[in-house]
């Protein structure tokens, strides 16, 4: 009996039958003779199955992969080779035991411990130009969980023998894998059947060929897609798929000689919009003009150009001109005194200054009648944007001014300054165009495309009345999409209410937000404000993004870019991305943390829920360590879990968290995400705060033009005996307070003149103020609160500044001696960078750091308080108290300089054991009250409290509980505050019981009352 044999490959071993043998006689005879290279492993159809580890010789040099080959000896005269090359190049799997414990599971991201059985998926190596394969490792359970969710047509493990290396496994692992295979098969019983195996053919020379002409054996590079998501382009025709044609609908319908194109009519429209305070009325006025025109017989102007000019602050063009330069150039054109124009400019409106002096000019009078068109104005603005030399700019301005009336020129100057002063934004203008125009513009930032699609839809309606088509909202590649934003979240309960479906909690990276656009080999990077990002921050990403997204030829990514330390793997602080700062960190890389994908391979993903977008991102992106990485994100469904995360983030000194609804779509420009930062919690109790002196002021702009509305804040340096600048503060005052401060503040106008900067002030040139205080020791003290203390070399207080400053209180009870000085400011900065001993608990709405409260511990106002825990203050707390607490000042005021993350010596709360859901509220409150440390409101306050005071025992208990010191009557001279008569200590401040309760309610010291 002669021997015949059949060669199988792992994917088709069980699927093929004897009928599928392809006859040949001589080609593999050499392999059959070398029995010593084969070992018996199993039986197939009752016949012995042999395994050969070396590749079959006849396959060497062919396109087939080298792998374990199965040989079956069968009785008969025929021999055969099965499985065509298409099947042989399919996805492969292997199995072994982890050798070093360094490889991570591709699914769960955990390290696979040394000696643990693991399954590998053999995939093309995207990091090698020469091709080749690499292995993605999984835990056994993780692999089958991934296969369970894979598409029905995806290759799955159907038999143990399909795993290369299975014969080296222990029996336990074999049984475990076999059980997983059985479970997978039962769950996939209802899925579509696998496509039939393509039969291979043999040529007379023994070469394997495909019966399909031109069949390709190259593995597809298309992106992987998860079940239930079909990434197919929308062929509705609404999305911009090609460049806008040269002859647009907007310009084709325009009659340049019609008065709707005159700048005069445009000015009238702006004036009407500005005169109406109602936003709905503003929109209606613009809508009427775009539909009916100035004569009421229909609009005959250029819709796109009109809308574009109505939005100079949105569609911005750089003209390289500031207010002083404009005044300087027009003083030459009008032949008038530049100093007079500069003084008038202090009123805050450069366009009004130009109008006034244009009307007064004798040598260059305005035109008698306005005949300029908006097309001519647009051409002038385009020309001006290309000029950088003063002489050229002056000539261009002179040319256009010679044809302008005074009001025409005023309007043009406002267009140059990107502010028509209509008190209306893009939404009010675009809503007049179409109800969906604003949303479409936010998504694509392509105004011309939006206008063209609106006009196209209007044409369709004219042809087929009643068939109105809604304007689609689509992203436009290589054009920045307005980023989705986050609103402030002040409590855990508010977050749970806003995200009822659960949320993704993501670390808020302290970097710079970047929107990445890729179209083939072309890349664009846009900042949060939609401006191009500086090249040194993003230039190298073009080398790594193709590796991270091997299947993506076009995409839009939402991400954060920051500098990451290669040794520790931790991000470096905000501001280190600058050229000079980055040079100081030699062992650091600029890393892109990707947290969203809104466009991929010509498909917009904005209308997909976040959970699907995140899954899509993980399926299509490969992390490149310290270059392109996923942002850290965790799914949260319980309030206690969220509270724990907030606590951990604040304790680690990170910026905060961003919370996103798992079902939320990507809404450009909408604040539908939530951000949690320490200065939002507990009504700002965790914010960085300092008491600073008002050293100078600056003129405001717009509605605050001509008045002091921005203030230069600083502190005293005892070492140099000079005053240093800390920050510029423009927020915190309402209009009434600002109006009052114009008269209350003692200021001297110096108009940023360097020669008038006093010797006692250390200030850099960029912060020369318009006004300066004559004597800083008599200046006002304000409490300035910000997100955090930061480093800014532009300020002279040892480079310390405050990020996002605002004035939270005018400290009438303090003078320059009791304000924060430079050594104290340095201490506050150091404390703010240390880990905060702070715990967030899931309590009532608006009290994210206080949890609950028991009725017996409520003050007269009903504010929640609790008993002081019997814990000793930490060493750092004592140190801070010793450095910053001055119990007595010359005028009797208490020193209350505040630290950043906490008030000095203050612990908002200690860690408490989590309360299980379902326990009674009272029990939870008692637990929190037993473990929580009170605010140190009265630190440094020494109070004489007469025993005859009504409610004496209760006042004493609360005052001492909040870290106050009571003095006896014989020691009244050491008191800083006295309740009652001050005869024995006139220097002490006289207070009342209401003052104690007011301090407890507001959680800080208030002015004596």
From Swiss-Prot:
Chain intervals with Polar residues compositional bias: 884-898
SUPFAM superfamilies from the UniProt entry: ATP-dependent DNA ligase DNA-binding domain (SSF117018), BRCT domain (SSF52113), DNA ligase/mRNA capping enzyme, catalytic domain (SSF56091), Glucocorticoid receptor-like (DNA-binding domain) (SSF57716), Nucleic acid-binding proteins (SSF50249)
Enzyme class: ligase
Any one GO molecular-function label of the UniProt entry: DNA binding
Cofactors named for this entry: Mg(2+)
Keywords, in A-Z order: ATP-binding, Cell cycle, Cell division, Disease variant, DNA damage, DNA recombination, DNA repair, DNA replication, Ligase, Magnesium, Metal-binding, Mitochondrion, Nucleotide-binding, Nucleus, Phosphoprotein, Primary mitochondrial disease, Transit peptide, Zinc, Zinc-finger
Binding-site list for Mg(2+) 1: 560
Record flagged with keyword Transit peptide: yes
Positions bound to Mg(2+) 2: 655
Catalyzed reaction equations: ATP + (deoxyribonucleotide)n-3'-hydroxyl + 5'-phospho-(deoxyribonucleotide)m = (deoxyribonucleotide)n+m + AMP + diphosphate
UniProt: Zn(2+) binding residues: 105, 108, 139, 142
InterPro entries listed in its UniProt record: ATP-dep_DNA_ligase (IPR050191), BRCT_dom (IPR001357), BRCT_dom_sf (IPR036420), DNA_ligase_ATP-dep (IPR000977), DNA_ligase_ATP-dep_C (IPR012309), DNA_ligase_ATP-dep_cent (IPR012310), DNA_ligase_ATP-dep_CS (IPR016059), DNA_ligase_ATP-dep_N (IPR012308)
Residues reported to bind ATP: 506, 513, 528, 660, 671, 675
Record-listed E.C. numbers: 6.5.1.1
Sequence ranges assigned to domain BRCT in this UniProt record: 933-1009
Residue positions of the active site: 508
Gene3D superfamilies: 3.30.1490.70, BRCT domain, DNA ligase, ATP-dependent, N-terminal domain, DNA ligase/mRNA capping enzyme, Nucleic acid-binding proteins, Zinc finger, PARP-type
Zinc finger (PARP-type) residue numbers: 93-185
GO biological processes: base-excision repair; base-excision repair, gap-filling; cell division; DNA biosynthetic process; double-strand break repair; double-strand break repair via alternative nonhomologous end joining; double-strand break repair via homologous recombination; lagging strand elongation
Name this polypeptide is given: DNA ligase 3
Organism: Homo sapiens
